[in-house]
């Protein structure tokens, strides 16, 4: 919440509501809707915001962070870490909301269930080749680790256009990390890059679809035109194209699926 307010997003979240319902198996968009309250206090349609507006989506990305960690052998399925306040050189402390002062041993699924910031920070530090130790300085060179983390997030649809059959889709806002380790850690918990609601839907759908990222589509069929007020012959059925398969094993994907289920 503090990070959202600091970036001027707090009021936006109070004035807008957006929703996407998608079939993860074939990319069919079953429903897409949005509303926003304008400056005059009037409720307006904002369906287009689902693929033209972007937000920091917070802890929702943590499943993608784990997948990136698995891909790069930074962590293993079922790995246990201690959730604890992380104390860095210079007095910086970073912690989880569910466990602000204690020391709790959790595995990867439990990290998703509890929305552990610390598990994700420790994963990101391992990905950077600099595992956490109390009092350590933040890693100086995080450019390569940032690319690896973003590549993992891209594979599930975060930070890329979804390919929906509508114009003016935005890929989100992906700022240079410029070797800022604080921004790199924030990226691991969804507090740096911004994504569209449709990207978030594709991300969850990719995990639900066992790692296959499907191109979403509004249209279902194309028919030949006729001179009569009737539907012409079917020309083509629109099917969701497989855009990519995430570079993870079935066990790794299932681990994230189970962690998501434990969160609800």
Place the predicted regions along the sequence by residue.
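Short acidic-aromatic active-site loops that bind/stabilize oxyanions
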Residues: 1-2, 54
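Single conserved hydrophobic/aromatic residue that forms the stacking wall/gate
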Residues: 2-13
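Beta-lactam-recognizing serine transpeptidase/beta-lactamase-like catalytic domain environment
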Residues: 11-53, 67-264
């Amino acid at each position: 919440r503090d990070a959202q307010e600091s970036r001027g997003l707090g009021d936006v979240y109070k004035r807008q509501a957006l929703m996407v319902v998608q079939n993860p198996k074939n990319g069919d968009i079953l429903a897409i809707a949005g509303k926003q309250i304008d400056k005059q206090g009037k409720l307006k349609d904002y369906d287009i915001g689902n693929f033209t507006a972007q937000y920091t989506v917070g802890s929702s990305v943590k499943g993608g962070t784990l997948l990136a960690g698995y891909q790069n052998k930074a962590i293993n399925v079922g790995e246990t870490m201690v959730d604890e306040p992380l104390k860095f050189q210079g007095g910086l402390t970073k912690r989880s909301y569910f466990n602000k002062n204690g020391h709790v041993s959790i595995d990867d699924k439990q990290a998703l269930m509890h929305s552990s910031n610390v598990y994700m920070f420790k994963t990101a530090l391992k990905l950077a080749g600099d595992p956490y130790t109390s009092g350590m300085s933040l890693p100086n060179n995080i450019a390569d680790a940032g690319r690896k983390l973003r590549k993992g997030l891209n594979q599930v649809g975060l930070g890329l256009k979804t390919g929906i059959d509508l114009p003016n889709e935005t890929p989100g806002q992906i700022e240079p990390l410029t070797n800022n380790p604080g921004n790199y850690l924030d990226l691991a918990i969804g507090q740096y890059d911004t994504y569209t609601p449709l990207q978030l839907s594709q991300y969850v759908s990719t995990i639900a679809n066992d790692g296959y990222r499907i191109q979403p589509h509004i249209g279902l069929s194309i028919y030949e035109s006729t001179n009569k007020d009737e539907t012409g012959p079917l020309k083509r059925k629109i099917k969701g194209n497989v855009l990519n398969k995430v570079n993870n094993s079935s066990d790794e994907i299932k681990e994230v699926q189970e962690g998501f289920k434990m969160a609800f």
